[in-house]
Each structure stands twice: as C-alpha cells, then as structure tokens.
Amino acid sequence: MPIYDLIIKNGIICTASDIYAAEIAVNNGKVQLIAASIDPSLGSEVIDAEGAFITPGGIDAHVHVDEPLKLLGDVVDTMEHATRSAVAGGTTTVVAFSTQDVSKKGPSALAESVKLDVDEYSEQTLYCDYGLHLILFQIEKPSVEARELLDVQLQAAYNDYGVSSVKMFMTYPGLQISDYDIMSAMYATRKNGFTTMLHAENGDMVKWMIEALEEQGLTDAYYHGVSRPSIVEGEATNRAITLATTMDTPILFVHVSSPQAAEVIKQAQTKGLKVYAETCPQYALLSDAITRCHHHGEVESYGVGIDLSSISESPFTNPDDRFIGSKYICSPPIRPEGTQKSIWKGMNNGTFTIVGSDHCSYNYYEKTSTASKHRAFDPENNKNGEFRYIPNGLPGVCTRMPLLYDYGYLRGNLTSMMKLVEIQCTNPAKVYGMYPQKGSILPGVSDADLVIWYPDDSKKEYNSKPKLITNKLMEHNCDYTPFEGIEIKNWPRYTIVKGKIVYKEGEILKENADGKYLKRGKSFMCTPKNEWVTEWRPKYES
C-alpha cells in the first residue's frame, strides 16, 4: 500500500556539498526520506531517474515581470508566463520585483506596494513559488527623518509580506538614487537585516556618453555597449563599497558583467568585507560581437565556447539589419570578447555568490500604431531606432540552469556540478532568506522542489531531450530568445515543485501548477560586521 506521494529511484543526488547515489521519497510536498533503496510499491507515483543527476530546484532571484514602460517598453511576461518558463528550465522558485509606488505614503507605504502585486499575481496560474524584492527609488522625506520612516516602512513590509531585500539603482533616469539616499537606505536595511541590492553603473557617466555619441551620429544598437564601458560599472561598484563600508552594511551587486567590477568586489571580499555579487549566463557566454557584427556587417564569434557554425538559426542571418543587435541589449551590457573568462573565474572563486538570469522580456517585433517594427521606431516622435530608445533586457529565466549545466559543468568552465548547485540553488536560498526550505534536499525540512536531468553518459536516445535551444522551448510570452539555435547537451527531464511534476519530458503539466507567494526570512549571509570607519554609530547602536 502506498505511503509516499512520489518515489524517485536510481538517481545521483547532487547538492552544494555532496554527490551520492540515493533514492528519494516525497510526501505532502516535502522531501520525506533519502535512502539507498526504497521499495517502489510504497509510492503512489514512481520515477526512474536512470542514473541521472537529481538537484534541488533552481532559484532565480532576479526576474522582472509585469513592468509597464519602466525601461522604454512593456515587459511581456506576467508572473504566470515567468513561472511557466522557469519550470521548463529547471527553476522552481523565482524572486521578482515590486516597485515602490510613490503615491503610497506613511508607515505602510512599501507594504501597500507589495500588496498590489501579490493581489494581482494571486489571480494567475503559477507554476512555482515566487517571492518579491522591493525596488526603492525615492525616499519619502529626503532628510534625517527619512531613514527613521524607512525603518518603519521596511519593518511593515517584512512583517506583512516577508519581504527582506531592497534593490536600488545607481543609473537610469527616474530610478537613479543619490549617494545620500543610498546611505539613508543602508541605515534602515542594516537595522532590519535586509539584503541591500545595487545596480552599479555611474548614471551621470552613461548620460554624458550617450549624448556625446548622439552628437556624432553613433546611435546603432552596438553603441549601447560603448556608452556603458566597463569603467562605468567599476566606478559605481567601488563607490557603493565605500558607502557600504561607511555604513557597515552588507551589499549584493546584481548582474555584474565587468571584469573591473569583479576585481573590485574580490578585493573587498579578500579584506573581509560583507560584499556579495550576482552574475548572469549572458555575461559568461555572449560577447559584444553579436551586436558589433551587425554594425560592421561582419560575422564574428558568438561568445565563449559557442560555435556559430553549429547554429541552425544564426542570429547573423541578415548582418545588414543593424537593429537585430537590439535583441542583445541589456544593462550592464554584454562585454567584449576575452572578458567572459573572468566571469567563469568569478563563479569558481567565490566572487559571484549567485547566478541569476535578470529575465526581462521585451518583444522584438513589438508594434504600435506609428511603429513599423518596434517602439524604438516612431517617426512622429523622432525615434528612428536609436539605442537610447531600445528597452534594456533579455529573456533568460528558462535557460539559466541548462546553460550552466552544459557550458559550465559539462564543458569544464565550472569546477564541479556541486558548484553549479551552490550558485544556482543553495546560495540564492541563503542570501534571500529561503534556506533550508528551498535550495536543499533535506528530509523533513526541504520542499520537494527537484530537478531530474537526463543521464549524461547514456547511449539511449531520448526523443524528448532537446539538442538546440529554440524559442518554442522557452514557454514564455516573448517572441525570441538570445540563445536561439545554440547547441545544448542536457536539459531538465522532470521539474518537480512541492512534490508535483510540473514539467515532464518537454511538456508542461498545468494541472499540477500550485505556485504560491513565498514569505521569506532574513538573509543567512548578509549580516553586519560591527566594524566602523569613524566614531559615528547609528542611533540604534548607541
């Protein structure tokens, strides 16, 4: 008689710290038992892993959904689309963003901003659990009183909705926040144990560079990257570390792309500072050749470890179409060839604590009443495809796990499969207050969020196993993927969320979708050192 909801047999469990052959029993959405052998008759459902890896479900803590006109366009994925795409690629938890609603005032203002999003997403079919970060871009009272009010607002957001992380921007008109306000925010995030996230680019440098390029008529998509050179990211990173050191506040840099920024981060970590960082697959795998070739009409290499000759649907099919490069515009930008090795190095040596996707999906063939191809083309408003009008962002929540499995683990750019689990599953859970419920495989404690991959060494042919990345495979609402046509050697065979199979051999099982809003705890890693550079102390430390 069955006593377990699900049994997984003949698998190789891989966690952040160990790899071993074992079998797993699941009950009531939790990992119930791990043993060398489990009687299959005890399970209502049984999966034979056939010697493949079983990993914790991936955690993508950098996902943008439902964001209208934030950065020049509409993000086309709802939370439903994003979670569907996530599970198709082995991610079982996403953390998206709730942008501060500046019309809300008073102690509950931030909690009310979160409530708007939670209420909206509760009406959608969700394929996995999700959490929310807060995007903070305006301090209600730009004065000493601001930090005290923000303290109360953060407490309310945590108590009501389990939000324990705040993101701020050092660039983008309308979102860029001053150093003064960053310090005020750090005052409050430190007190409340929030993870402080920063998009580090010097916004004033970017603004100046954009205007200087436009003055010379250099406005193709390629020049987006030229306007945001590595030094722009490096300067802002160094400045943010200085602010954080002054405030004794742990910080996490999101989507780091620059070797210069990575070096500054590693130096701070070597000094014992509480500095963490996230990078993304696009910075390890793509190079700016993908935009440069359209600008110069040349076909060059795609990036590190990716052979264009094997790509069936080459992004370089029409090198004369300079606007195709807009498919690869993100901020920070994809960097020149040769820099990607430093990103892999950072994943292996601890510079990068986590890997997120920065999923931010904009349609390439978006049309408006006055635009022939894209919102960036709007002659009535003097828009002719200039890079300043192209939305910044790439879809990527589905490809994050498989790309690092193949181009990281299988091809030797990551030191081990355990490293993949550490930076894609376990560390995100620890950094963002979800461990050990998420990001681990611990009996009686962890949610049964699991990924069963295809066997790597099997000679058996699996018709459901993809060989190339295609947009159809993504299960998102976007009309392209930047990795179209790229060879892929493995892919999730089964994605299991809280004990239910939601993705099986290429098929989404909508009837098993049961994602919920996830209230998070405080970070396991982002705790202050209680070391100060001056005699000043926050009042709450007095």
UniProtKB/Swiss-Prot annotation:
Binds 2 Zn(2+) ions per subunit. Its cofactor is Zn(2+). Substrate binds at Y172, S331, N392. The keyword Metal-binding applies. Homotetramer. Belongs to the metallo-dependent hydrolases superfamily. Hydantoinase/dihydropyrimidinase family. This is Dihydropyrimidinase. It comes from Lachancea kluyveri (strain ATCC 58438 / CBS 3082 / BCRC 21498 / NBRC 1685 / JCM 7257 / NCYC 543 / NRRL Y-12651). The lineage of its organism: Eukaryota, Fungi, Dikarya, Ascomycota, Saccharomycotina.
